[in-house]
């Protein structure tokens, strides 16, 4: 964490204000029964199991607990990551992609690229390879929006950043609370 805070007083959401998937007891029972039947059918007939579709809530859940590099809070608590700013297109036969728009806490946030890189790394580690991941700064929320977007979606720059052990250590620290 930085000694000199750029945003000394960020707006913080309480954990109970964050979006979450609420499953009713019946839904859980139906879901587990369906999964069990699918597994049995798969074993008996060697039919390839259908893939589970991925929705924005699942992506949000993957990102919400990432720690901010400057504050002892999560990206969800700081509203850097919001459910409504996540787009998922999961095509069975075509291209599948995920776009996450991040909202920096201040327009001149120097941590924006680091946060975006962490989001990209987290998604690339967790998602099947069929997904193309785009991480972008939400329009009008950062002074260097186009430069940050270019860096976050340049495959060579991202790969080079992930080879830097010190930077990778920082990213892993930010993701340490993710389960």
UniProtKB/Swiss-Prot annotation:
The keyword GTP-binding does not apply. InterPro entries: FSCA_dom_sf, MIP18, MIP18-like. It holds the Pfam family FeS_assembly_P. Residues 1-26 are annotated as: Disordered. The keyword NAD does not apply. Keywords: Chromosome partition. GO terms for biological process: chromosome segregation; protein maturation. One of its GO terms (cellular component) is cytosol. SUPFAM superfamilies: Fe-S cluster assembly (FSCA) domain-like. May play a role in chromosome segregation through establishment of sister chromatid cohesion. Belongs to the MIP18 family. This is MIP18 family protein C144.16. The lineage of its organism: Eukaryota, Fungi, Dikarya, Ascomycota, Taphrinomycotina.
């Amino acid at each position: 964490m930085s000694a000199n805070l750029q945003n000394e007083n960020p707006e913080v959401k309480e954990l109970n204000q964050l979006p979450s998937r609420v499953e009713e007891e019946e839904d859980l029972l139906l879901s587990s029964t369906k999964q069990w039947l699918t597994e049995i059918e798969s074993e008996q007939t060697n039919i390839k199991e259908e893939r589970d579709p991925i929705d924005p809530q699942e992506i949000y859940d993957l990102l919400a607990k990432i720690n901010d590099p400057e504050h002892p809070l999560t990206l969800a608590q700081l509203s850097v990551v919001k459910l409504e700013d996540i787009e998922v297109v999961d095509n069975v036969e075509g291209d599948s992609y995920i776009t996450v728009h991040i909202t920096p806490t201040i327009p001149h946030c120097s941590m924006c690229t680091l946060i975006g890189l962490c989001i990209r790394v987290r998604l690339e580690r967790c998602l099947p390879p069929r997904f193309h991941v785009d991480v972008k700064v939400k329009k009008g929320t950062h002074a260097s929006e186009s430069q940050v977007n270019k860096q976050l979606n340049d495959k060579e720059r991202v790969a080079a950043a992930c080879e830097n052990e010190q930077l990778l250590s920082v990213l892993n620290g930010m993701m340490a609370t993710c389960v």
